[in-house]
Swiss-Prot record:
P700 is a chlorophyll a/chlorophyll a' dimer, A0 is one or more chlorophyll a, A1 is one or both phylloquinones and FX is a shared 4Fe-4S iron-sulfur center. Keywords: 4Fe-4S, Chlorophyll, Chloroplast, Chromophore, Electron transport, Iron, Iron-sulfur, Magnesium, Membrane, Metal-binding, Oxidoreductase, Photosynthesis, Photosystem I, Plastid, Thylakoid, Transmembrane, Transmembrane helix, Transport. GO terms for cellular component: chloroplast thylakoid membrane; photosystem I. Chlorophyll a' binds at H675. The lineage of its organism: Eukaryota, Viridiplantae, Streptophyta, Embryophyta, Tracheophyta. This is Photosystem I P700 chlorophyll a apoprotein A1. One of its GO terms (biological process) is photosynthesis. PROSITE patterns: PHOTOSYSTEM_I_PSAAB.
Amino acid sequence: MIIRSPEPEVKILVDRDPIKTSFEEWARPGHFSRTIAKGPDTTTWIWNLHADAHDFDSHTSDLEEISRKVFSAHFGQLSIIFLWLSGMYFHGARFSNYEAWLSDPTHIGPSAQVVWPIVGQEILNGDVGGGFRGIQITSGFFQLWRASGITSELQLYCTAIGALVFAALMLFAGWFHYHKAAPKLAWFQDVESMLNHHLAGLLGLGSLSWAGHQVHVSLPINQFLNAGVDPKEIPLPHEFILNRDLLAQLYPSFAEGATPFFTLNWSKYSEFLTFRGGLDPVTGGLWLTDIAHHHLAIAILFLVAGHMYRTNWGIGHGIKDILEAHKGPFTGQGHKGLYEILTTSWHAQLSLNLAMLGSLTIVVAHHMYAMPPYPYLATDYGTQLSLFTHHMWIGGFLIVGAAAHAAIFMVRDYDPTTRYNDLLDRVLRHRDAIISHLNWVCIFLGFHSFGLYIHNDTMSALGRPQDMFSDTAIQLQPVFAQWIQNTHALAPRATAPGATASTSLTWGGDDLVAVGGKVALLPIPLGTADFLVHHIHAFTIHVTVLILLKGVLFARSSRLIPDKANLGFRFPCDGPGRGGTCQVSAWDHVFLGLFWMYNAISVVIFHFSWKMQSDVWGTISDQGVVTHITGGNFAQSSITINGWLRDFLWAQASQVIQSYGSSLSAYGLFFLGAHFVWAFSLMFLFSGRGYWQELIESIVWAHNKLKVAPATQPRALSIIQGRAVGVTHYLLGGIATTWAFFLARIIAVG
């Protein structure tokens, strides 16, 4: 029997009025740094101001003060999110054709922006159907609003106003919790309490209230909409909530109230809490009754999880105990000391959260098309492509951010004197083995995946199709992926006997869902072409990981620069007199990792865009014949590099290149402008600091001659600043180019 010491009572931990609110201080640029607050001597000042404004570590070394600043900043972030959401809902209320779309979502496109007619700009307002002229939007908000049961633009207005109120509330909270009642450090470090509140409150009660909204508001309203009832005739949300008889007409078991729940006769509720699988043939989205059931189940899980950790009462898990008990026969001290790292280094904490959130965002990207959650989402090809692309980019950036903050943790917060033989120390001690093996994997994947394509290009060029790797010659079938697909396709009759269809139509079988003559989803065939491009995915992902992981593991020291930790997170080179030590800082690894992340995600979204147009999206005739947008050319065309260039990039760019004079012309201009932004980045990436400093001094001389020289001395960008500006424009230009290319294409043909 273990006798524990009595648990200390947890007190409310805040400091009252710790920092006075001062607008004078606020208006003084760089008030957080003695050097920057002096004002500008050279133009470098403005760059340092931006670089350090949010680097709270550089303002103070007091962890409590840093924690308070981060906490307060989070409220500011939430305020901006509410403001953005309010703007989206306001556009839906004021400038959109939402009510018209709701009455006929298969023939009318969503639009929530009308361009003012200045010198011919009204050309941008295309006809989206139903006599409405505007810009077709691809954010998926209309589908989301329909799923939540919004039936009028007035409801959107009210929600927009509500979001503004919340934005103001968040701004107030950010000020209040920094200036009036700021939490003490112990409050930020009380992980069990935080877990309980986030799990039970945010995720548990959040999911439960959403499930409640779906059952009492969304389901009945959507049932009416699916039956073709005019939105104006449907009772309002509060009528369903207040009047049980209304719901009982649609779902008879509602008449029994909570009796079946307390008598454990839960199957009574299976009218509106279903387990069907597959898609609703009317809307092409997941069954909303399945979604409500899912949120109820998730809520139960998180409500239970939110009661697992030990706080004021002496029962439940302690995170420190769990981590310290977590050691195996080959892992030394295991996770001993990890608790201290995660409660004193917010960079370490943020790194883990970014890695998990980034991975989750990419999982969301895939689920949005494989299991389209909202009504009429699957047949809105522009929105499907946009949602996939958006979530892939966001996921990529978050994962690079995880590596960035892991490296900052290593440089600023890691204390090697207190860490011995725990898992992190063991990883650091055999980092050479890890990185060299990972490097070997990258070389193997790169040569072999690219080599398969080069072989195909060569055979194709020489007129020897029978010697190519393809579904019709030398087959390289993705047998493991096909096996997984098949297993899931058979699951409803075997491992999931309660389900009537598999989780996603993409797995296989002979189901096809079409809405209004357009394919929503069908089984996605995988073949040699997918096998080839998946190995390119493996290659680009592994190289990205190699660069980022090397940056983290060698952030403090390396054979080349043993004292790297003293140089900080970002530095250009190891001082003058030591050649060959440039681009070794942890920051530089993040910089280089961003380019490979861009490579990796680009291949993924290109693959997705072409695959869906070739093998999934299209129209279906009355006889049941499916005609795909690009006629199934992916399997034979994408197996050569030339095929990617000719049949994807060039063939599908015709819409954006020929968009002038049409409502898509803005995409043509963006395509051009984004190429320019991308090319502009090369000026920063391919030139050194000295070149620009020389040029600047010549220009300053001319200004002096004319007596118009500024008081602030102009300076060339530092090496790091130049790289930062370069990578920013590279990514912005590349992503915006892809965006214009994708949207002009899919809006024209989809």
